[in-house]
Every structure is written in C-alpha cells, then in structure tokens.
UniProtKB/Swiss-Prot annotation:
NCBIfam families: PRK00823.1-2, PRK00823.1-4. The keyword Lyase applies. InterPro entries: PCD_sf (IPR036428), Pterin_deHydtase (IPR001533). Keywords: Lyase. One of its GO terms (biological process) is tetrahydrobiopterin biosynthetic process. It comes from Chromobacterium violaceum (strain ATCC 12472 / DSM 30191 / JCM 1249 / CCUG 213 / NBRC 12614 / NCIMB 9131 / NCTC 9757 / MK). It is an enzyme of class 4 (lyase). Its EC number is 4.2.1.96. This is Putative pterin-4-alpha-carbinolamine dehydratase. CDD domains: PCD_DCoH_subfamily_a.
Length: 108
C-alpha cells in the first residue's frame, strides 16, 4: 500500500487500528514513534524561516486532507503529532498524513 496515493476519509464512529496494523504502518515511516495514542516526529531545521515554511506547507496538506496535526513550533524544529480524536487513537488517516509530511520534508 502506497500511503502517498491515498486520501483521508471521515472517521466518525470508527475504531482505532489494531496494534499489529499500527506496527506494520509505523515501519514504513522512518523516525516516527508512537507516544500514547499519537504518531509523533520532530523535524529539525536550520532556522526559524525554514521551520515556518515547513509548518505552512504542512498546514496546506492538512487542509487538503481535512486531517490536522497538533504541532509544537520552535525556532529550529517542529514537533508533529497525528491522532484521530473521533476514533480515540490512530487510524489510517494518521499514517497517510504522516507519509505526506515525510514527503514534504524530503522534497528537494
């Protein structure tokens, strides 16, 4: 499954993914980790301008997918957390958006 080719879908009333599915999907996302019921990664940048450019581009992706991360923004880093609150845990939407976040960060 190529997460980059998928789009988020409404998750109202859905259950979180099973642990084995979470582990399998997590293995496709370098340096992401599970913290509680969130999928998290810290991205590092050279300066505030690069950090904010990334955050703004990620905001555009989140708007397109209608799935929004919690973020903590600092001078040279951004901490990105995905979780599906309606499901009370992780859904495929979180992994789709994490993959798209990775692609954004790795884009030349």
């Amino acid at each position: 499954m190529n997460l980059l080719e998928l789009s988020c879908t409404p998750q109202h009333g859905q259950s979180p993914l099973a642990d084995n599915t979470v582990k399998q999907l997590l293995s496709t996302l370098p340096d992401w980790e599970i913290v509680g019921i969130e999928l998290r990664k810290t991205y590092r940048f050279a300066n505030y301008h690069e950090t904010m450019a990334f955050v703004n581009a990620l905001a555009w992706i989140a708007n397109q997918e209608d799935h929004h991360p919690d973020m903590s923004v600092h001078y040279n880093r951004a901490v990105v957390n995905f979780s599906t609150h309606d499901a009370g845990g992780l859904t495929l939407n979180d992994f789709i958006c994490a993959a798209k976040t990775e692609a954004l960060f790795r884009r030349p």
